[in-house]
Amino acid sequence: MAFDYVRAAKYFVLWDFIKGFALGMKYFVAPKPTLNYPHEKGPLSPRFRGEHALRRYPSGEERCIACKLCEAICPAQAITIDAEPRDDGSRRTTRYDIDMTKCIYCGYCQEACPVDAIVEGPNFEYATETREELFYTKEKLLENGARWEAEIARNIEMDAPYR
């Protein structure tokens, strides 16, 4: 009999409505879990693999020694390298192209590079209007490296204990 009184009291007090309203107010005042993307950006992992870049030494010399390990290990065959010897006996690239339409962003090129010349940087916003813009030349890759060098160096330093 007491159970019927409790059930009737909950019915007349609109207990289910009050519980639902309280739950709605809880989420109304809580911080939003979503980001307003173009204006707000979430954090990226130091291991994030984005747009490719070629790095230079602090002296300004290109890091790439034209060993062609990245070209050999690329499963998509997206990298093309031509090299020639210099006067001091070392090799330097004359052509370093990446076909981004073929690239699968596996990161093997970055792992294979003995001098950390080719890296996948933190930039993920590189949509283009034409397909030709996705064929990266050596100049474009060096420009990306110059633009993102500080962040790339920080990410490599943070990832160093795991390499």
Swiss-Prot record:
Its cofactor is [4Fe-4S] cluster. [4Fe-4S] cluster 1 binds at C64, C67, C70, C113. It is an enzyme of class 7 (translocase). Its EC number is 7.1.1.-. Residues 55-84, 94-123 form the 4Fe-4S ferredoxin-type domain. Binds 2 [4Fe-4S] clusters per subunit. [4Fe-4S] cluster 2 binds at C74, C103, C106, C109. GO terms for cellular component: plasma membrane. The keyword Iron-sulfur applies. The keyword 4Fe-4S applies. GO terms for molecular function: 4 iron, 4 sulfur cluster binding; iron ion binding; NADH:ubiquinone reductase (non-electrogenic) activity; quinone binding. It is found in: Cell inner membrane. InterPro entries: 4Fe4S_Fe-S-bd (IPR017896), 4Fe4S_Fe_S_CS (IPR017900), NADH_quinone_OxRdtase_chainI (IPR010226). It is a peripheral membrane protein. It catalyses: a quinone + NADH + 5 H(+)(in) = a quinol + NAD(+) + 4 H(+)(out). Coiled coil: none annotated. Keywords: 4Fe-4S, Cell inner membrane, Cell membrane, Iron, Iron-sulfur, Membrane, Metal-binding, NAD, Quinone, Repeat, Translocase, Ubiquinone. GO terms for biological process: aerobic respiration. NDH-1 shuttles electrons from NADH, via FMN and iron-sulfur (Fe-S) centers, to quinones in the respiratory chain. The immediate electron acceptor for the enzyme in this species is believed to be ubiquinone. Couples the redox reaction to proton translocation (for every two electrons transferred, four hydrogen ions are translocated across the cytoplasmic membrane), and thus conserves the redox energy in a proton gradient. Belongs to the complex I 23 kDa subunit family. NDH-1 is composed of 14 different subunits. Subunits NuoA, H, J, K, L, M, N constitute the membrane sector of the complex. This is NADH-quinone oxidoreductase subunit I. It comes from Rhodobacter capsulatus (Rhodopseudomonas capsulata). The gene is nuoI.
